[in-house]
Amino acid sequence: MHDDIKLVSGEEIVKPTGEVHVVYFSSISNNTHRFIQKLSVKNSRIPYELEEEINVDSDYVLITPTYSGGGEFTSGAVPKQVIKFLNKENNRNYCRGVIASGNTNFGNTFAMAGPILSKKLNVPLLYQFELLGTQNDVEKINEILKEFWGK
């Protein structure tokens, strides 16, 4: 689906330790927030307001929506709040994988934030889902996270 996906080899993947934890960003629409509430894992929300911040001190998987106009318009695919969060070295260093949401109406830029962040952070893109996700997406992500943590 995305031409610029960098495959992370098995040797490069750093498996997370500790409690299963997702860090996520959700816009005012709260689509991602509502999805996260269906997961059975510890979670931390990246604040919407750029002046606010959180610091993470344990391994996590990042879940983010995608912002972009579709087609050739991939600029701005990663929300500014996520970029600000990851600009802190400590937050960036604990990220072990990425899951992205998007809208299939935008064609080949569907969930584009996932491949962009996976490549930038050199972590695996674990899953992509549409908008609010389905019950199947919830079950699949719970399974992926449990397996990724080795639980």
UniProtKB/Swiss-Prot annotation:
State the Gene Ontology terms under molecular function: FMN binding
Q: Which organism is it from?
A: Mesoplasma florum (strain ATCC 33453 / NBRC 100688 / NCTC 11704 / L1) (Acholeplasma florum)
Q: Which family does it belong to?
A: Belongs to the NrdI family.
Q: Which GO terms describe its biological process?
A: protein modification process
Gene that codes for this? nrdI
Query: Under what name is this protein listed?
Result: Protein NrdI
- Please name one Pfam family that this protein belongs to: Flavodoxin_NdrI
Q: What does this protein do?
A: Probably involved in ribonucleotide reductase function.
